[in-house]
Amino acid sequence: MKKNSRLKFSTVESWSKNVFNLNTKRAYVEEDGAIEWVTGSFGSRISMLYPMGILAGARAKMEYTGVSFAGAEQNLDTGAKVVHIGPNTYSMMMAKSLSKDGGISTTRTLAKICKTAVGAKSYTDCKSLILDDKSISNAIPEVKVECDDAEVSHEASVGKISDEAIYYLKTRGISEDEARAMIVRGFTGDISKELPIEYAMEMNNLIKLEMQNG
């Protein structure tokens, strides 16, 4: 991507459950350029998907917002990678994953700050939500810092829907299934609002179908 260019790359993928989804997305960003990745990953037997930004120019930026949903017999390994080369570069990665019916969901991120990336800032937030007792969710943020003058932070958390939250919503006249769906919609809301409206509607429909399966 050339100087001062901007690109927002939005995808919502829904593959057949027998597909092996191994694809590569990469952006080389020059001075004052910006790449934004927004992804929803559904379906497939196995997915390995990590959009990458190489921030080569001064003040280049990358933002990533993504969600994946692993159901029965699925192993979805998703996230993003960024390499800071230029000075005063910026990255933000927010990755979320859900798993149910024995699915395996892994959120994996990498932020590398090279020696030349003086003044770089990088923030990572990985959150995973497990929807039953037989599924697996992993959050794996990785940071490599070679520059002393950089600001880097990362968070990772794995949780379940609490019985207290379900009970509270049920006392308000909401069924247990709808209560779970509401909590999931809240969990994925950050991603939905970054998508074009038709993509957001499609993603919400896919989440609804995944919640109904099993």
PLM features: residue spans?
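Small-residue helix-packing motif on alpha-helices
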Residues: 60, 179-180
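Small/polar glycine-rich anion-binding or flexible loop at a beta-alpha turn
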Residues: 162-165, 181-189
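Conserved beta-strand/loop scaffold segments within soluble protein domains that form the structured core
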Residues: 1-167, 171-174, 192, 197-214
